[in-house]
Amino acid sequence: MSNPRQLALQIQINERASLNNFFVSKKNNKTIQILKNILLGSDKGAQIFIDDLGSNGKSYLLQAICNDFSNSNNSSIYIPMQEAINLDPSILEGVSELNLICIDDIDLINKRREWEIALFNLINECYEKECFLLLSGSINKLEAIPDLVSRIKKMEILRLEAINDDELLEATKAISKNLNIEISDKNMNYLINNSKRDIKTIFRTLSQLEKESLERKKSIGLNLIKEVIQNS
């Protein structure tokens, strides 16, 4: 459940997100295991940057980690910069008192000096207070003040790789199961072959299918899949 600090931001978090529901491709096994160790408390005060060059699921992953961490009676917050960038950087003040801070898409703060300084100060505070700090974005797109770039590059950098094409069907089935929706293999293959082949798009399409199916009180057939893909 979201903590009061999360609610105060008026930024929603997907409360169904969990590492138990995150499809782990073979190339991401090491990354996910390191992140799970954080949840187990075996690496107190870790500072990690998740480098994601595409739509490989980093936003869901950060929300899943926040939820799982909070469910273990720890405090956490998820801050997506796509929404927070329009807020005052002062929202970062005091968050180092929490056990875990996840900030998504930090490369969006490029050329915004007040945000760059606020994030630099937060990194220092988290180091002193040994709170967990997870940042995500594209390390190659980061163009900020030198001190901030230097600090981030000293973090443990984990790469979130794209799912292989031969894993897409398995991933789609796993997501469908977690959403409690039923789609035939034939229709699932149609969905994959007619969508952008990344896990973010697949998840968004399946989530919309779940919503439409519930609202219309009908099963998910080919016509509904075509409609959702066309409107996405």
Regions found by a protein language model. Name each.
Residues I139-N140, M155-E167:
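Conserved AAA+ ATPase "SRH/arginine-finger" region at the nucleotide-binding site
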Residues M1-N37, L214-S232:
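A short, basic N-terminal segment
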Residues G94-E116, L122, K129-S138:
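Conserved P-loop NTPase "ATPase switch" module shared by AAA+ and STAND
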Residues C66-L100, N110-R113:
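Short glycine-rich substrate-engagement loop in P-loop NTPases that contacts/grips substrate
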Residues N140-K154:
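Short regulatory helix/loop adjacent to the ATP-binding pocket of P-loop NTPases
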Residues S195-L209:
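The conserved phosphate-sensing helix
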Residues D43-L62:
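Walker A/P-loop nucleotide-binding motif
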Residues E182-N194:
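Short conserved motifs of the RecA-like P-loop NTPase core
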